[in-house]
Amino acid sequence: MMTSVPPRKTWWKSKKTVKVRRSYSTFPSLNAWEKFRGLLPVDGETNPGVGLGVEEGLLCQMVHSPEFNLFPNSVVFESNFVQVRRSRDWKEIYKASNTMALGVTSSVPCLPLPNILLMARVIWHQGQSQTWNRPSTVPSINLKSILPLKFVELQIWDHHERILRLRTVTEKIYFLKLHPDHPETVFRFWIRLVQILHKGLSITTKDPTILVTHCLVPKSLCSPGGKSELVQKNSKGLQPSESLTHLMAQGESEALSQIFSDLHQQKQYSSSRSEKVQINKTSSEKATPCEDSIPCTCDLNWRDAFMFGEWERENPSGPQPHSLLSTLAASSRPRLSLIGGNSI
């Protein structure tokens, strides 16, 4: 005979759990914003810079290779040129199988503007198609120069023939004609690059009253004995540019900028201290030059006016574009009616 046992009732009351759903405002990721602004290609679409042959080309692959490992996190904006010489008609110096790869990049990825120029000699095999990104047979490429853009003068020399004039600090002059396989859009990017390197972007500042930390070149340098006025007089006829040694390696360039920043701050401190001492002296005493001041080297050419911008900061405020091609395209529309000789 089966007996049914009634279930026991617990003496405590079971607590009811209520699930509370909290709603948080979701923000798109940085890559989503970059895609919305057109700075990154959408999934499934090819990068327009790769299609034009100005990004991820032979020069970029070479400097990012394990052999060089230069500026691994920076984008390289590059194109292929043919070196020509001046005459009645522009004539090619080398054979058609020899081209010059010219590109710009940044020593630090967060810089909105490039500050390094790359030059390489490319020798294509006989009968090889000169494709820029993924050639079937790797051509012979030789890296010729890595120069800071401060020591380079770049001009749009012949708009019709698509020729650039490149002059280095050693007075070496190159006339480079854009390869005929590149479309006209690529040359417009180079025109825009010359413009923004000369005038800057809207996000940059060249106001000397704004304190820019870790600036490589101080705004004003004075030499003992009052020679700064002589330097300014002698430099009026020179092209505006900036001069001081700049190391291309990222760690060394950051260390150099830190040294110049510390020297510049020390100079400001010592000059303010000397002014306080001069106030306490009698008016008959002459002010002595500061011992800690940085002397100017009068033999440096291409120094008319020191200009610096936000692209020379080690840590610019706010996120910056990661693509040089997108930086050129996102800036204001270029003025294509340029006269030969617009230089940076």
From Swiss-Prot:
GO cellular component term of the entry, any: Golgi apparatus
Q: Which residues form a coiled coil?
A: none
Q: Which UniProt keywords apply?
A: Golgi apparatus
Q: Which domain of life is it from?
A: Eukaryota
One Pfam family hit: GARIL_Rab2_bd
Primary localisation category: Golgi
Which cell locations does it reside in?
Golgi apparatus
Biological process annotations from GO = acrosome assembly; acrosome reaction
**Sequence similarity:** Belongs to the GARIN family.
Instruction: Say what the protein does.
Output: RAB2B effector protein required for accurate acrosome formation and normal male fertility. In complex with RAB2A/RAB2B, seems to suppress excessive vesicle trafficking during acrosome formation.
- Its recorded name reads Golgi-associated RAB2 interactor protein 1B
Query: What organism is this sequence from?
Result: Rattus norvegicus
Which gene is annotated as encoding this protein in its UniProt record?
Answer: Garin1b
